[in-house]
Amino acid sequence: MFSSKERFADLFLKRLEMTCGKSFKDSAKLDQYKTLGNMVREYISADWIETNEKSRSNSGKQTYYLSIEFLLGQLLEQNLMNLGVRDVVEAGLKEIGINLEEILQIENDAGLGNGGLGRLAACFLDSLASLNLPGHGMGIRYKHGLFEQKIVDGHQVELPEQWLKNGNVWEVRNADQAVDVPFWGEVHMTEKSGRLHFRHEQATIVTAVPYDIPIIGYETGTVNTLRLWNAEPYAHYHGGNILSYKRETEAVSEFLYPDDTHDEGKILRLKQQYFLVCASLKSIVNNYRKTHKSLSGLHKKVSIHINDTHPALAVPELMRILLDEENMSWEEAWHITVHTISYTNHTTLSEALEKWPIHLFKPLLPRMYMIIEEINERFCRAVWEKYPGDWKRIENMAITAHGVVKMAHLAIVGSYSVNGVAKIHSDILKEREMRDFHLLFPNRFNNKTNGIAHRRWLLKANPGLSAIITEAIGDEWVKQPESLIRLEPYATDPAFIEQFQNNKSKKKQELADLIFCTAGVVVNPESIFDVQVKRLHAYKRQLLNVLHIMYLYNRLKEDSGFSIYPQTFIFGAKASPSYYYAKKIIKLIHSVAEKVNYDPAVKQLIKVVFLENYRVSMAERIFPASDVSEQISTASKEASGTGNMKFMMNGALTIGTHDGANIEILERVGPDCIYTFGLKADEVLSYQENGGYRSREYYQHDRRIRQVADQLINGFFEGEADEFESIFDSLLPHNDEYFVLKDFSSYADAQERIQADYRERRKWSEHSIVNIAHSGYFSSDRTIREYAKDIWGIKPMM
């Protein structure tokens, strides 16, 4: 099919006419995109079947990765690259007058995630397939994703994400493998032959229908599967209002992260989580039973990984299957469960560690609650035996306490491995946040520093840079990213530096064009592109960035002797629809942009840009063009971060706190090649535990801080005097929870160092190349090898 450009072009034209019922000249770009996508899917079908057979018959284990998010982005170009046929396709299409780039832009980003959690899951799937490892994803097929972000008068407005409006060429619906998921109802117990038996009756059934997406490895022939579950009405429903039932059923897979500020939203989120877990475990068990009569050896052949706490119900659901369907004893079922399930923790933020009110949980999932109660009872008894009389410890460690079910505790107790995602994050978990659990299960905790799919974020996103790297050190880095370290000597090579700078200039011009087309702002491509793109949250401190821009604006206006190297500040972020404070930060960014971009006294030196509806395909345009990577979260709050790695891999220099993977980047590149500032994690934690921080002191003693804080409420933004009162209050009356004012001066100093260093372009480029050379460690290939060896016990398929 892809053996030559001529053969491909001929088959493409025939397939287009056959499937679309149109002549080539009458076909639309969408027709051409679907034709190409279907050809790729057909091309890999034999490998997909073979991989599934290998996974099933493999003498070792296979892994199932359960995640509420999978932020895939666009798949067509990545698949063409992984199959090694992109050049043939591009040349063949050119022969018949089609520009491949135009076809690629037709594809919608898959609306299956929000931020780092989902993108990490997608990177892991890429590495699993590219390393020939038997690993598959399990998620939900959200009809409308998170939301499509629109900016109206500086305010975020959420619209349904229409990513499926033209269908999805990659998915295969497997209705014959649908399973039923029960909600509500009652559990009845009967005793038979001295054992209790449980029946879940009068439940409301939702049918979970799987849609499978192929995950194609890079030049391996391995095609793993991402299975996404779609919620559909039960065919034999005989309850009340059928229309109401249909709406409630379809809502389960309609949106990612429905608003949970009210009970209805909490119930829907909990439904989603059990829907994912129940459907996935039934599918896993059904697949396992094809080659095994009993589930007694499940843990020897299957590893189930839960990505954050959303799939933590895998613990009681696997117990339910083993107890109620296999009639195992509690002890045997528990042994299998805690040798099958592993858990990644992604946060130290207490509000992000899910807790479900029992008064909602118990009626919705009655059998799950019964099993969790028993797990909790047995666990608390074990803690008592180890720490007799220590009621406080038991209270702190209990899975159910104070009217809630603590999902992180459930995940820890029911897993054989608990890992953090950066060294400092794992240390904080062990020494502080989960100290009691670590003392009880010292061998259960470990670290696996996150990684990114370098073939997407460098090879695909930045082909120009990839080409000059390959010219310098060969192409081994594509499959062995650690070999990028061989690039380090080229950091002082004048010819390589010139090539690097030329490519960077080209990518910056392309981003400048995109900014003008999407935001209507003219930016100077020769300016410093200073970029902060990530989920909007107070701890990520987009506010610190904005307040510093306001300070620069003030100084440029007031001090005629002050000047800076032109700097363009670029933001991209979505705020949760119910996160009022985060949405106010978005509005503030736009108000500052309005002030700065149209002031003739400063607009040649500063520009502020907010890119609407930030997503994976946009990120692929942003990272290669960036000079400065903003990784400025409050120390101890960012578990790892992966944006820092994507920027690093494309030669941007990090300005960052001593947090997450920033610390590990610093360890590799050295202090000259990164700009660190601010409080360290232990200092932040000390303030939080012992007090002593008073933000008003910084407000009173630093004129810069006082001026920008006052401007939030004194009419500086015309017609918006009350708009940012909540932000002002967060900094002063509420004492600045995330230490924005405390770190302001240190951050401003780091920005001054950036200003000075960027003027020495050769030295700046040297530091950029050093970053690229050390970025191979942060490939998800390395991360997945560690998971495979240390946690899952899986080996490459032969």
UniProtKB/Swiss-Prot annotation:
EC class name: transferase
GO biological process per UniProt: glycogen catabolic process
Keyword field contains Transferase: yes
Entry's induction text: Expressed exclusively on media containing carbon sources that allow efficient sporulation.
GO CC annotation terms, alphabetical: cytoplasm
Matches recorded under InterPro entries: Glycg_phsphrylas (IPR011833), Glyco_trans_35 (IPR000811), Pyridoxal_P_attach_site (IPR035090)
Pfam families in the record: Phosphorylase
Keyword field: Allosteric enzyme, Carbohydrate metabolism, Glycogen metabolism, Glycosyltransferase, Pyridoxal phosphate, Transferase
Documented EC number(s): 2.4.1.1
GO-annotated molecular function: glycogen phosphorylase activity; pyridoxal phosphate binding
Co-factor(s): pyridoxal 5'-phosphate
The keyword Flavoprotein is annotated on this UniProt entry: no
N6-(pyridoxal phosphate)lysine, modified sites: 646
Enzymatic reactions: [(1->4)-alpha-D-glucosyl](n) + phosphate = [(1->4)-alpha-D-glucosyl](n-1) + alpha-D-glucose 1-phosphate
Top-level taxon of the source organism: Bacteria
Family matches, as Gene3D superfamilies: Glycogen Phosphorylase B (3.40.50.2000)
Role, per record: Phosphorylase is an important allosteric enzyme in carbohydrate metabolism. Enzymes from different sources differ in their regulatory mechanisms and in their natural substrates. However, all known phosphorylases share catalytic and structural properties.
Family statement: Belongs to the glycogen phosphorylase family.
Name of the protein this chain belongs to: Glycogen phosphorylase
Organism in which the protein naturally occurs: Bacillus subtilis (strain 168)
Gene behind this protein: glgP
